Curated annotation (Swiss-Prot):
PROSITE patterns: ABC_TRANSPORTER_1 (PS00211), ABC_TRANSPORTER_2 (PS50893). GO terms for cellular component: cytoplasm; excinuclease repair complex. GO terms for biological process: nucleotide-excision repair; SOS response. Signal peptide: none annotated. Disulfide bonds: none annotated. ATP binds at residues 259-266. This is UvrABC system protein A. SUPFAM superfamilies: P-loop containing nucleoside triphosphate hydrolases (SSF52540). The UvrABC repair system catalyzes the recognition and processing of DNA lesions. UvrA is an ATPase and a DNA-binding protein. A damage recognition complex composed of 2 UvrA and 2 UvrB subunits scans DNA for abnormalities. When the presence of a lesion has been verified by UvrB, the UvrA molecules dissociate. Its main location: cytoplasm. PANTHER family: UVRABC SYSTEM PROTEIN A. Belongs to the ABC transporter superfamily. UvrA family.
Length: 569
């Protein structure tokens, strides 16, 4: 048990290296022969060659595999099983993955779709399947395939329940249960449960108002044109499946990086551009960027901020109040009340990170961790402070009739009204409300925030700062887990950041975000290695990309632009 605990603590600093076997093959003596497939440059293929191919290429190989004579007859059932299962994986949008891909490198959405493909292959009936946002990370083309797969599961005689924000998924459903009316304490009720058409006709449903077009995310009346003098140029990007890509990124604009899954978006932006900028601007030395030859224009920026969906903290002590800097002035207010001064309490008395005012039984966590060894750890409320984090003496100090625990239990909206007369607090709390987090509690544990909520807390922190207008913000699918109304709020925040002169780069599949961009860089045409992806196939305004032949993003974008309303000037 002790060894397991030690391994868990050391795991974050482990480095994975390729084993020194011939071509890192793992199993390098197994061979398969294919005489007809044009993919083969020789008659024999080693097992590790096949497992390293994209699934689409692997499927083509097995479909054309000719073993000859009775060997073909013996292998027929096995080959049928292999091709069917590969087909299921491709139909859920995973054509760019390889069989050798390590499970720990898969995103949550990819892992979920692999499990979905295995269920389709099992052919079970009478099963209830529950999926939580399966569209995460999927291009619109792959999303259509996914919806077809879910309908196939239903047609087999199963029940399919999907928690989803995607408009196409909602419209494709047989039955929709809409929760609300708001988020957090303002939600929790079933507003309406009916067909998508009935949902769209429901005035009380925010989802329905967006489905009916009464509420909408508008196309901007005027897009910010690119300035040829303000360009960031990255040359020779060749990491993973990138084909010697030259990226010309206009600064001061909102730029969307698009393309089907596996086309190289994350490699180009997260693994190459972001790491170069973090190394050269932020003086970060942790990670080396993927291969490239040259970068020009970084002198026009002073820092890069990667606003991702990673947690804002990994312990119960981390919360929105501590992350955004709201907690320090709150503690100063409590330390300044007359009773605190009489007792000699300073600001540290109201911290749950140091001894003095905190509950020592739980060391200010409010909960106790129970290690389960082979299962996720369980947190139970502290029996001494009952989750209040502080000792009795500290909780006796009141500010405007509330103790420190009661303030941390307030929602952002309640705290904004409570501290309205304190400009420092009011301004920071307003930014949290601006990004749609009015329902979150100030002291809510970081471990309970979703990825989308954590990302918006980070955006709120950036909004509250005074900046120089020379910052590069990188966001990777910020719409994950967001409702239409939340996306509208997110776009308002991004517009404010851009309005200060900053540059925004967004890796995104959501067409409502893409259509509002000033500039689009589309990668593809397909995903994976070989001739699949890794090239820039279209760039320009959304209208330019929509008119580009051969761009899947352009095909879907043209339909959205034709059916969307333009904002009033």
């Amino acid at each position: 048990a002790r060894a397991i605990r030690v391994h868990g603590k050391l795991e974050p600093i482990y480095v994975e290296t390729v084993a020194e076997l011939p071509e890192a093959s793992r199993l390098y003596t197994v061979r398969a022969r294919c005489e007809r497939s044009p993919l083969c440059v020789c008659r024999w293929r080693k097992f590790h060659h096949i497992s390293a191919w994209p699934l689409s290429k692997t499927l083509d190989f097995f479909q054309n595999l000719d073993l000859g004579g009775n060997k073909q007859q013996i292998a027929e059932k096995v080959l049928k099983e292999i091709t069917e299962r590969l087909g299921f994986l491709i139909n859920v949008g995973l054509n760019y993955l390889s069989l050798a891909r390590s499970a720990e490198t898969l995103s949550g959405g990819e892992a979920q779709r692999i499990r979905l493909a295995s269920q389709i292959g099992s052919g079970l009936t009478g099963v209830m399947y529950v999926l939580d946002e399966p569209s995460i990370g999927l291009h619109q083309r792959d999303n259509d395939r996914l919806l077809g797969t879910l309908k196939h599961l239903r047609d087999l005689g199963n029940s399919v329940i999907v928690v989803e924000h995607d408009e196409d998924a909602i419209r494709a459903a047989d039955y929709v249960v809409d929760m609300g009316p708001g988020a957090g304490e303002l939600g929790g009720a079933v507003l309406i449960a009916d067909t998508p058409e009935k949902i769209a006709a429901c005035e009380q449903s925010i989802t329905g108002r967006y489905l009916s077009g009464k509420e909408a995310i508008y196309i901007p009346a005027q897009r910010t044109p690119k300035d040829a003098e303000r360009m960031l140029v990255l040359k020779g990007a060749s990491g993973q499946n990138l084909k010697d890509v030259t990226l010309e990124l206009p600064l001061g604009l909102m730029t969307c990086i698009t393309g089907v899954s596996g086309s190289g978006k994350s490699t180009l932006i997260n693994d190459t551009l972001a790491k170069i900028a973090q190394r050269d601007l932020n003086r970060a030395t942790k990670d080396e960027p993927s291969p490239y030859t040259e970068i020009q224009g970084l002198e026009q920026l002073d820092k890069v901020i990667n606003v991702d969906q990673s947690p804002i903290g990994r312990t119960p002590r981390s919360n929105p109040a501590t992350y955004t800097g709201v907690f320090t002035p709150i503690r100063e207010l409590f330390a300044g009340v007359p009773v605190s001064r009489e007792r000699g309490y300073n600001v540290g008395r109201f911290s749950f990170n140091v001894k003095g005012g905190r509950c020592e039984a739980c060391q200010g966590d409010g909960v106790l961790k129970v290690e389960m060894h082979f299962l996720p750890d369980v947190y139970v409320p502290c029996e001494v402070c009952h989750g209040k984090r502080y000792n009795r003496e500290t909780l006796e100090i009141l500010y405007k009739g509330k103790n420190i625990h009661q303030v941390l239990e307030m929602t952002v909206a309640e705290a904004h009204a409570f501290f309205e007369a304190v400009p420092t607090l009011s301004r920071k709390l307003q930014t949290l409300m601006d990004v749609g987090l009015s329902y979150v509690r100030l002291g809510q544990s970081a471990t309970t925030l979703s990825g989308g909520e954590a990302q918006r807390v980070k955006l709120a922190l950036e909004l509250s700062k005074r900046d120089t207008g020379r910052t590069l913000y990188i966001l990777d699918e910020p719409t994950t887990g967001l409702h239409f109304a939340d996306i509208a709020l997110l776009l308002e925040v991004i517009t404010r950041l851009k309005g200060k002169g900053n540059s925004i780069v967004i890796i995104e599949h959501n067409l409502d975000v893409i259509k509002t961009a000033d500039y689009i860089i589309d990668l593809g045409p397909e995903g994976g290695d070989g001739d699949g992806g890794g090239r820039i196939i279209a760039q320009g305004t959304p209208e330019d990309v929509a008119a580009t032949a051969g761009s899947y993003t352009g095909q879907y974008l043209s339909q959205v632009l034709a059916n969307s309303q333009t904002a009033a000037v």
